[in-house]
Amino acid sequence: GYSERYEQLRDARVDTEGLSFSFIPDTNSMEAFQSFFPACTGAPGFAASLEEETGIFTLRLYNTRLKSGEYTREMAQWASSWDYDGLYPRTIPEGPLGEDNLFLSQVEICQDGDDAVITARLTDRAGWFTVDSGNLGYDNIPYLRLRFRERDSMEVECGI
Protein backbone atom coordinates (compact mmCIF):
# COMPACT_ATOMS: atom_id res chain seq x y z
CA GLY A 1 0.00 0.00 0.00
CA TYR A 2 0.89 3.65 -0.39
CA SER A 3 0.52 4.78 3.21
CA GLU A 4 -0.65 3.56 6.58
CA ARG A 5 -3.91 5.49 6.26
CA TYR A 6 -7.08 3.62 5.28
CA GLU A 7 -10.17 5.12 3.71
CA GLN A 8 -13.60 4.06 2.50
CA LEU A 9 -15.28 5.53 -0.57
CA ARG A 10 -18.37 7.49 0.43
CA ASP A 11 -19.25 8.51 -3.12
CA ALA A 12 -17.79 7.82 -6.56
CA ARG A 13 -19.24 9.28 -9.73
CA VAL A 14 -18.71 10.31 -13.31
CA ASP A 15 -19.66 13.96 -13.63
CA THR A 16 -19.77 16.40 -16.54
CA GLU A 17 -16.02 17.02 -16.62
CA GLY A 18 -14.48 13.91 -15.11
CA LEU A 19 -14.52 11.91 -11.89
CA SER A 20 -15.45 12.85 -8.31
CA PHE A 21 -14.85 10.93 -5.09
CA SER A 22 -15.43 11.53 -1.38
CA PHE A 23 -14.01 9.51 1.50
CA ILE A 24 -14.86 8.49 5.05
CA PRO A 25 -12.97 6.39 7.63
CA ASP A 26 -12.55 2.68 6.87
CA THR A 27 -14.58 0.70 9.41
CA ASN A 28 -13.05 -2.72 8.72
CA SER A 29 -11.01 -2.43 11.94
CA MET A 30 -10.49 0.04 14.78
CA GLU A 31 -6.86 0.45 13.68
CA ALA A 32 -7.92 1.36 10.13
CA PHE A 33 -10.63 3.68 11.47
CA GLN A 34 -8.17 5.54 13.72
CA SER A 35 -5.70 6.03 10.83
CA PHE A 36 -8.19 8.56 9.40
CA PHE A 37 -7.97 11.80 11.34
CA PRO A 38 -10.56 14.43 10.29
CA ALA A 39 -9.26 17.85 9.20
CA CYS A 40 -5.76 16.37 8.88
CA THR A 41 -6.63 13.58 6.46
CA GLY A 42 -6.85 14.33 2.78
CA ALA A 43 -7.79 12.18 -0.16
CA PRO A 44 -5.85 8.91 -0.33
CA GLY A 45 -2.62 8.54 -2.23
CA PHE A 46 -3.25 7.63 -5.84
CA ALA A 47 -1.57 6.78 -9.12
CA ALA A 48 -2.89 7.59 -12.58
CA SER A 49 -1.70 5.91 -15.75
CA LEU A 50 -2.62 5.73 -19.42
CA GLU A 51 -2.17 2.78 -21.74
CA GLU A 52 -1.59 4.75 -24.93
CA GLU A 53 -2.28 1.90 -27.37
CA THR A 54 -5.78 1.28 -26.02
CA GLY A 55 -6.62 4.69 -24.52
CA ILE A 56 -7.40 3.07 -21.15
CA PHE A 57 -6.95 5.45 -18.21
CA THR A 58 -6.44 3.84 -14.80
CA LEU A 59 -6.73 5.52 -11.41
CA ARG A 60 -5.60 3.54 -8.35
CA LEU A 61 -6.72 4.86 -4.95
CA TYR A 62 -4.37 3.33 -2.39
CA ASN A 63 -5.76 1.73 0.80
CA THR A 64 -9.32 2.58 -0.20
CA ARG A 65 -12.24 0.19 0.21
CA LEU A 66 -15.52 0.04 -1.68
CA LYS A 67 -17.40 -1.70 1.14
CA SER A 68 -17.50 -0.66 4.78
CA GLY A 69 -17.35 -2.81 7.83
CA GLU A 70 -19.53 -2.19 10.87
CA TYR A 71 -19.48 1.28 12.46
CA THR A 72 -19.12 0.25 16.09
CA ARG A 73 -19.95 2.08 19.30
CA GLU A 74 -16.20 2.19 20.05
CA MET A 75 -15.60 3.99 16.74
CA ALA A 76 -18.43 6.43 17.41
CA GLN A 77 -16.99 7.23 20.85
CA TRP A 78 -13.47 7.72 19.45
CA ALA A 79 -14.79 10.05 16.73
CA SER A 80 -17.10 11.85 19.17
CA SER A 81 -16.83 15.35 17.73
CA TRP A 82 -17.05 14.23 14.09
CA ASP A 83 -20.45 13.02 13.06
CA TYR A 84 -20.22 9.89 10.92
CA ASP A 85 -23.60 8.51 12.06
CA GLY A 86 -25.78 7.67 9.09
CA LEU A 87 -22.83 7.20 6.72
CA TYR A 88 -22.52 3.45 7.34
CA PRO A 89 -22.98 0.82 6.13
CA ARG A 90 -21.79 1.96 2.72
CA THR A 91 -21.00 -0.01 -0.43
CA ILE A 92 -19.92 1.24 -3.84
CA PRO A 93 -20.81 -1.68 -6.15
CA GLU A 94 -18.10 -3.02 -8.43
CA GLY A 95 -18.76 -2.55 -12.14
CA PRO A 96 -19.92 0.43 -14.22
CA LEU A 97 -19.58 3.72 -12.35
CA GLY A 98 -21.98 5.88 -14.32
CA GLU A 99 -22.84 7.50 -17.61
CA ASP A 100 -20.18 8.46 -20.14
CA ASN A 101 -19.18 12.11 -20.53
CA LEU A 102 -17.30 14.07 -23.21
CA PHE A 103 -13.94 12.71 -22.03
CA LEU A 104 -14.57 9.26 -20.53
CA SER A 105 -16.49 6.15 -21.55
CA GLN A 106 -16.88 2.66 -20.12
CA VAL A 107 -15.93 3.83 -16.61
CA GLU A 108 -15.69 0.94 -14.13
CA ILE A 109 -14.61 0.52 -10.52
CA CYS A 110 -13.34 -2.54 -8.66
CA GLN A 111 -11.55 -3.57 -5.48
CA ASP A 112 -7.99 -4.83 -6.08
CA GLY A 113 -6.57 -5.99 -2.75
CA ASP A 114 -6.50 -2.93 -0.48
CA ASP A 115 -6.96 -0.48 -3.38
CA ALA A 116 -9.94 0.84 -5.33
CA VAL A 117 -9.21 0.87 -9.07
CA ILE A 118 -11.10 2.93 -11.64
CA THR A 119 -10.63 2.32 -15.36
CA ALA A 120 -12.05 4.31 -18.27
CA ARG A 121 -11.57 4.63 -22.00
CA LEU A 122 -10.55 8.17 -22.91
CA THR A 123 -12.45 9.74 -25.78
CA ASP A 124 -10.72 11.61 -28.60
CA ARG A 125 -11.58 14.88 -26.85
CA ALA A 126 -9.60 14.10 -23.66
CA GLY A 127 -6.35 16.02 -23.66
CA TRP A 128 -5.29 16.64 -20.07
CA PHE A 129 -6.70 16.75 -16.56
CA THR A 130 -6.31 18.65 -13.32
CA VAL A 131 -6.65 17.33 -9.78
CA ASP A 132 -8.49 19.15 -7.01
CA SER A 133 -8.77 17.92 -3.43
CA GLY A 134 -9.94 19.27 -0.11
CA ASN A 135 -12.47 18.61 2.65
CA LEU A 136 -16.26 18.79 2.74
CA GLY A 137 -18.62 19.26 5.65
CA TYR A 138 -16.87 20.12 8.88
CA ASP A 139 -13.50 19.20 7.34
CA ASN A 140 -14.23 15.55 8.02
CA ILE A 141 -14.93 14.22 4.50
CA PRO A 142 -12.01 14.53 2.04
CA TYR A 143 -12.77 14.75 -1.67
CA LEU A 144 -10.83 14.23 -4.89
CA ARG A 145 -11.87 15.53 -8.32
CA LEU A 146 -10.26 14.89 -11.68
CA ARG A 147 -11.36 17.43 -14.30
CA PHE A 148 -10.57 16.61 -17.91
CA ARG A 149 -10.10 19.18 -20.68
CA GLU A 150 -9.87 19.10 -24.45
CA ARG A 151 -6.44 18.87 -26.06
CA ASP A 152 -6.37 22.44 -27.34
CA SER A 153 -8.06 24.17 -24.39
CA MET A 154 -6.40 26.54 -21.96
CA GLU A 155 -7.26 27.25 -18.34
CA VAL A 156 -7.45 30.94 -17.54
CA GLU A 157 -7.61 32.08 -13.93
CA CYS A 158 -9.57 35.26 -13.35
CA GLY A 159 -9.45 37.06 -10.05
CA ILE A 160 -10.47 40.31 -8.50
Each language-model region and where it sits:
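Short linear recognition/processing motifs and adjacent strand/loop elements at protein termini
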Residues: 1-160
